[in-house]
């Protein structure tokens, strides 16, 4: 009955791609749908079956035999190897169409009855749009030379040097190359996650779109056991960065120590090697102070489009109390505050709440209160009844219990900004 086995190789055409990157191939001779990741609709592919369950099968893409009719050469030489991007082999319009169909399919399933679908708002910039990049140290293959870049697609260990990455601008590429050169010269090893030894971990670069201010932070393990080498590296590196000819302006060079076992950029003490540990960005005429680890939409010009839309949806806020839940550094709150009676923000990350207060002062706004805490717990203590509610939760979405409390306020309008469609649906 179950003729499809692990290790078998098939060919087929990817008919659709479901969120986030699951290509669906119908294998007619077996009458099975197989999920093959990392393809685009219309490609004829060869794949080997690596999982077979009741009615479900998954395959690993071996090669693309025929390109899809709408496929193009990616502008980035790293595409396909690098795990950073998924659809660079499609023109922007096709990427948008594909993502729109994925989200629409989820909403159709989740929403009972009719709803208005407004389609996709495009980003004003299609490449070099990111205001933040995180790069990892490692090697391209076991015991290879030191590398600094992104994880290889589907790999926890291997790193691709992405010196021609197209999603940040030329300054990112220069800073990346300069850092890698200094790191290689130092002879210090990268931090090996399995063995918990080594030095270099991550490079974090943030650059504001409007002010062009740049903040650079290198994340390393502690220097124990490496003698004077780390200090020598940091001095040389900071000097080398300042000597680069960049289009933006470096306002801060930082060094963060992180000895935690997880592979995340985590702050366990940061020293300033040059300048300051923050920079400014502007959105819709407001000014925001951003610290190395605080959350900020990664595409500044795209964020303006998003927040304009949110402002349009929330409608007239005149003389109204607005709750901004999961408020982060207060971006949305401040965009709404100038015309509202009062905005109440709730955010669990203390650092973000402090930043939000600073940002409110910067923009001369005083009709605000910010609460630090979990929305679920704090919502009962706010002592106010909102007229409108704005939600902008993290990827996992809103805790179901918190959602009930939010709905019980019975507001006329609630605007939900979701950064992951599955948690919204």
Describe each model-derived feature in a short phrase.
Residues 23-28, 149-152, 217-219, 356:
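Short, acidic/hydrophobic/Gly-rich beta-strand patch recurrent on exposed beta strands
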Residues 1-74, 78, 369, 377:
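Terminal RNA-binding accessory module
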Residues 42, 168, 299:
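Short, conserved phosphate/pyrophosphate- and ester-handling motifs at nucleotide-, phospho-/glycolipid
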Residues 63-74, 83-190, 210:
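Extended interfacial segments that mediate partner engagement and assembly in macromolecular machines
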Residues 15, 128-141, 145-153, 202-209, ...:
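Short beta-strand elements
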Residues 205, 212-221, 287-291, 388:
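Short, aliphatic-rich beta-strand segments
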Residues 157-201, 222-252:
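Internal alpha/beta scaffold segment
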Residues 1-7, 11, 19-20, 225-425:
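Rossmann-like S-adenosyl-L-methionine
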